[in-house]
């Protein structure tokens, strides 16, 4: 890669400022690596070189995508949404120009939008594809591109691999010439307001009404896209008992008022807690910057805050959906393979079928696509705070979940109960399955090697017992094999390949997987055992020592 040529083109790259703030190692990585279009699209840091996001690598991606779309169908169409991050607007315009150059009709909004509305818009406008420009909850110097198929789900693995090949065939991004003509820009159309209206109507119909109680809510968008749509939605449902964390409900690509724009991180709630204490609020809700994930916390009468993890929120929402859909037959819940044993136990107890899929909401969307006319999907979720109640969206959707959780909490409040009370009742009914996640960040090329080494070592040395827990089976989703230790047999897993190892016990499971979007390796634990916290810490220390 011609580093000198890249530096000469820095002024045109849109990212010169970011490049100049990077360390020597970070700068070098941009020239020594390449962005790859994977199953979750592309996500990375800004900077120079083919390993970073900049004007030229975005043009390369857009050109490859244009060729892919034109090869798939005649007269393709696409809708593009973008969040509040640095360069999201600029990247959206670049991609729109490239696609328009290839006679692809592009629907482009004049302001930021949420990820779930993009999924809805693809279906509503009946476009060939969709693009979401976001890096979700990553730090401020990241952005990314997610591509959606015509059913509103993220691209399948096979389609992603094909798009990746088209992108690679483009070659050197510095050699791309994108002429702009008035004739071509006529292919770029304004995004219809009717789509947003229809999206809100679907949620309004799903919720019905929120019962009158004295529930008080604090809401924060963490500087992201869920404002103004969430406040407008709540008001349309005649729910006005909420306060916004005003400082965090303004779009800010630097996420200035939060240490972490991630609802999984309790620090994201710091200002919400302050406001809740002042306003004596009961329920605190935060959404991540692109509004596909949400976190909740609850404040009791003494000012004590209870934070709920993604699995606990999933259990609460599943419990509520089971109550709401008692008249339906053939009910189905879908969750990822690293999500809790608690929700599976709750589904079994209530005669609700459940399915497990690989991590990534597109695999949940694939299951939804394959439902027959008799099946009723009542809930889907991932432990990473992604939830879906009704499938008019084919990705996780915090916007539809906010009023749902408020309605649930309002009903409980009428009976003098809380979400914490309800969770305790679930534990008493199906058992106290507890969950935790250890996430280890290992950045750069060295970090990537370390992650690979950990996975290889774990595969080469499969355990028979861990901290007194007897291993029943080991599932390796990379080889699509499950080894039953008690029977000494190996069988196939009917699932796409993925770099995940899951160890099963009578008490639950642990799972190990590298993140697909961040330089992290994650250890998941879902167990019903005494001294859970101590056992979890010891297993984490054993694997990562």
Language model segments and positions:
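N-terminal small/polar loop signature for handling phosphorylated ligands or for N-terminal nucleophile
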Residues: 79-142, 239-296
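Phosphate-binding and adjacent anionic-ligand microenvironments
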Residues: 277, 281-283, 304, 324, ...
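Conserved phosphate/anionic-ligand binding catalytic regions in large, soluble enzymes, centered on
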Residues: 31-51, 136, 221-229, 233, ...
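An N-terminal, well-structured beta->alpha segment
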Residues: 2-95, 101-102, 185-215, 225
């Amino acid at each position: 890669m011609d580093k000198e040529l890249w530096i000469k083109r820095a002024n045109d790259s849109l990212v010169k400022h970011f490049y100049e703030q990077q360390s020597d190692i970070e700068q070098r990585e941009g020239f020594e690596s390449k962005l790859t279009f994977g199953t979750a699209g592309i996500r990375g840091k800004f900077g120079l070189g083919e390993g970073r996001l900049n004007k030229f690598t975005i043009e390369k991606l857009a050109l490859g995508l244009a060729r892919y779309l034109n090869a798939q169908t005649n007269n393709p169409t696409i809708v593009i949404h973008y969040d509040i991050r640095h360069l999201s607007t600029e990247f959206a315009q670049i991609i729109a120009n490239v696609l328009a150059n290839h006679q692809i009709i592009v629907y482009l909004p004049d302001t930021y939008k949420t990820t779930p509305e993009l999924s809805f818009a693809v279906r509503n406008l009946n476009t060939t594809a969709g693009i979401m420009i976001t890096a979700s909850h990553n730090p401020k110097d990241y952005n990314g591109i997610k591509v959606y198929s015509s059913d509103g789900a993220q691209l399948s693995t096979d389609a992603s691999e094909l798009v990746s090949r088209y992108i690679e065939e483009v070659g050197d991004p510095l050699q791309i010439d994108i002429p702009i003509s008035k004739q071509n820009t006529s292919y770029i159309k304004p995004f219809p307001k009717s789509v947003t209206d229809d999206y809100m109507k679907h949620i309004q119909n799903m919720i019905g009404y929120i019962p009158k109680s004295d529930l008080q809510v604090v809401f924060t968008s963490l500087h992201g896209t869920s404002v103004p749509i969430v406040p407008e939605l709540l008001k349309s449902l005649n729910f006005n008992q909420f306060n916004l964390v005003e400082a965090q409900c303004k779009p800010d690509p630097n996420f200035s008022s939060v240490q972490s724009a991630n609802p999984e991180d309790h620090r994201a709630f710091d200002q919400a807690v302050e406001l809740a204490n002042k306003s004596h609020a009961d329920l605190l809700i935060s959404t991540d910057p692109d509004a596909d994930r949400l976190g909740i916390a609850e404040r009791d009468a003494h000012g004590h805050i209870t934070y709920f993890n993604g699995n606990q929120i999933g259990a609460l929402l599943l419990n509520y959906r089971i109550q709401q859909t008692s008249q339906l037959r053939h009910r189905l819940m879908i969750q990822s393979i690293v999500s809790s044993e608690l929700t599976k136990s709750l589904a079994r107890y209530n005669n609700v079928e459940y399915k497990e899929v690989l991590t990534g909401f597109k695999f949940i969307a694939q299951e939804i696509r394959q439902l027959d006319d008799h099946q009723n999907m009542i809930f889907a979720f991932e432990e990473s705070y992604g939830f879906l109640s009704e499938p008019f969206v084919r990705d996780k959707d915090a916007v539809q979940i906010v009023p749902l959780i408020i309605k649930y909490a309002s009903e409980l409040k009428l009976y003098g109960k809380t979400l914490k009370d309800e969770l305790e009742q679930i534990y008493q009914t199906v058992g106290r399955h507890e969950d935790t996640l250890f996430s280890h960040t290992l950045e750069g090329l060295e970090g990537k090697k370390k992650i690979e080494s950990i996975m290889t070592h774990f595969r080469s040395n499969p355990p028979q017992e861990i901290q007194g827990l007897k291993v029943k089976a080991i599932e390796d989703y990379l080889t699509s094999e499950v080894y039953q230790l008690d029977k000494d047999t190996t069988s196939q897993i009917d699932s796409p390949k993925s770099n995940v190892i899951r160890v099963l016990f009578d008490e639950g499971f642990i799972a190990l997987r590298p993140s697909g979007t961040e330089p992290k390796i994650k250890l998941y634990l879902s167990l019903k055992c005494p001294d859970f916290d101590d056992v979890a810490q010891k297993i984490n220390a054993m694997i990562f020592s």
